[in-house]
Each structure stands twice: as C-alpha cells, then as structure tokens.
C-alpha cells in the first residue's frame, strides 16, 4: 500500500499560535511524503476524520507541567470511542511546546502517551538522536517519547524556529 493512500490527523490546541506553528510544520513534513494530512484545532474536531485516519498525532502547549484543558476535554470526549475501541491499532504520536527548556514537557508527552495506550493505539516515539543545543538542532531537548519544542516570549511568527 502506498503512502498516498494513508491518512494522518494532527489534532492540537494552541492558545497563542506557537503550538499551531509546530503542528503546521509537522503537517508539511508528512505531506512531503505523500500522506493525506488533516490538521485540526481541538475546538473544531471532525470526529469522522479522526475515526478514519490511519494515524493520529496529538499536541498541546505545556501548561504548569501538564496538558492544556482543551486537549484534556477532547480526551474525555473520546470516551465512546474508547469503549468501542474505534482507534485501536492506529498509530499515535505526540508533541508539546512550552516557554521553558524543560517545563516538565515529558509529563505532557506521558499523558498523551497514556491516553493513546488507553485507546489501544500503537505509539511512535521520536527516533532522532540529539544533535546539539542550538535552536536549529534536531532533538535539542533529547526527547524520545515525542517531539518537544520551546518558544521564547515572542510572537508565533518568530518562535519557535522552523
């Protein structure tokens, strides 16, 4: 089966645009491989698209070492799908963005991972070795559970860097 017949839904929450920027860059990368990508904010979720997608990527900012309440609401709203095992066997991944270099982003990825596991999804981590510490380096935060990004206190047009 070709990649062009596969679909990916990226569901994210972004209060100030920084996490939306990360979601958009992930979508652009996936589209380059020929995968059909659906990008949606948690406040405008198309449940049918999520149900039909081959893979789901969830993302949100790190707030106080936890997921955003908007993503938590989506998780709770998925209860009927959990009971029906609708997403069982789908690939899943997660990402988070925050102002601090750590800010307990790992806890956010663990929460997203646990949500995916509850649904019987197959988790895909980040396979990239850390390459350095500059804002342009791949996996500069040495995360393997999922993508961690950091934004300075500036507009989403400036930070995080692509």
Language model feature labels by segment:
Residues 141-150:
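Mobile gating loops/cap/lid regions near enzyme active sites that modulate substrate access
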């Amino acid at each position: 089966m070709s990649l062009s017949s596969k679909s990916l839904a990226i569901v994210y929450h972004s209060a100030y645009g920084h996490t939306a920027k990360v979601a958009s860059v992930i979508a652009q990368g996936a589209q380059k491989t020929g995968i059909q990508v659906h990008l949606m904010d948690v406040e405008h979720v198309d449940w049918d698209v999520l149900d039909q997608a081959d893979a789901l990527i969830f993302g949100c900012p790190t707030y106080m070492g936890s997921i955003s309440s908007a993503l938590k609401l989506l998780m709770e709203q998925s209860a009927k799908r959990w009971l029906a095992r609708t997403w069982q066997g789908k690939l899943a991944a997660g990402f988070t963005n925050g102002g601090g270099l750590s800010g307990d982003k790992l806890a956010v990825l663990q929460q997203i991972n646990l949500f995916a596991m509850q649904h019987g999804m197959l988790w895909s981590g980040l396979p990239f070795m850390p390459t350095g510490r500059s804002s342009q380096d791949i996996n500069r935060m040495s995360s393997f559970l999922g993508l961690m990004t950091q934004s300075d206190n500036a507009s989403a047009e400036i930070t995080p860097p692509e």
